[in-house]
Structure formats: C-alpha cells, structure tokens
Amino acid sequence: MKLYRTGLLLLAVLCTIPVFAGQPPRLKVGSSSGIFGPVTNWTYETFAEAKRAGIDAIEISASTLFLNKEMTDDRQIEARCRQLKRDLKRAGIEIWSVHMPFGREIDLSQTDEAVRQRSVELHRRVLRFCKILSPRIVLFHPSWYLGHGERDARIAQLVRSVGELLPDVKKIGARVVIENMLGYELVKDGNYERPLGRTVEEVL
C-alpha cells in the first residue's frame, strides 16, 4: 500500500512538469536602450534591426530620454515618447522597464532633505512621461556613492522616497524594483562607501 501511494505521488509530480514537443519555448531576450547609442539613433529602422538580431524587449534609460539638455519642453518630450512607443511596437519590441535617472544631485537616499525632495519631484515628472511608454517595471537607482557611516540614514531616506513615489508608479500600471549595485568591498576609497544595494542582505 505504501509503495502504491508512493507511485501515485511520483505520477502526480511528473504530471506537473511541462512536457515540450521538441525544443522548449524560447525565452524573451532583452537589452538596455544603451545599445542604440544617442537618442538620434532611436529610430524604427534601428529597432527593426535589433528585432532581427533577437531582441524582444528593452529597458529605457530615463536619463538619456528625458534629461537631454535640448529637450526641456514637456510637449516635445511627450511627442518623443509617443513616437518611440510607436516605433518599438511596429518593430515588435516591448518596453519592459524604465531605468530612472540617477546622480549625486538626483539621489532618492539623500540626507539633505532639500536635495531629496527635488529628487522625488524629478522622478514624479519622469513618471508622468513614463505613463505614455507603459512599462511593466520602473527601476529606481538606490543611491550615489555614500560618505562613511551614512548607510543606515541613507537606507531610511531611500525607503521614504520610494514610499512617496509608489502611488505614482501604480498609476501608470507598473511595479517598482530597486537596482542591485556592484561592489563586494564596502569602502570605495578614503572619502566614499559604495552605493546602497551592494548585498542581498542590504536590499532585503
């Protein structure tokens, strides 16, 4: 009887394993928009070539798309976003995610409250444009390089900023993720520690 039950259990487990006829389904291949170079290269022809090379999805660099010094007019940026979405859709490439801006003066973890608030407002402005693009994911950069001994305070500020921006992300139908950073060594040099998110434990 015990052997019979074991056999049924094994059969049940095997029935849950997908059975593929021939080759398993192809996974989607994605890339950063960085492969296309400057925004002037972001054309349907470029995207179509990328699709032929096997690219199915893309992460848009918000810094490249929205923080171009020549593009300060909101209507101009909105028009660019609509054209970008049309060209990518026509080429068969999905806008999977948007990598939000980052830098010392646009740091969501800043302990200088004035800088943090400006950073949050900049992110809000970018998210309004992201609504046109309809990404699945919005990726926040956790921080710039930190001064020594700032990590706990910076983590608290990052959590605060993301909490303030979460409703804006939900409005565009996307999910928030926080970028994991490099740097197995905590200290970069005599002045700085590496950015937040450098270990799994820190992200959790």
Regions found by a protein language model. Name each.
Residues 3, 20-136, 152, 163, ...:
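N-terminal pre-domain/capping segments
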Residues 24-25, 57-58, 153-204:
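Acidic/histidine-rich catalytic cores of soluble enzymes
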Residues 73-74, 111-112, 142, 146, ...:
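Short amphipathic alpha-helical patches
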Residues 9-11, 66, 186:
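Extended rod-forming repeat segments used as scaffolds/tethers
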Residues 96-108, 139-147, 174, 183-186:
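Substrate-binding cleft and catalytic face of glycoside hydrolase catalytic domains
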Residues 7-18:
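Bacterial N-terminal signal peptides
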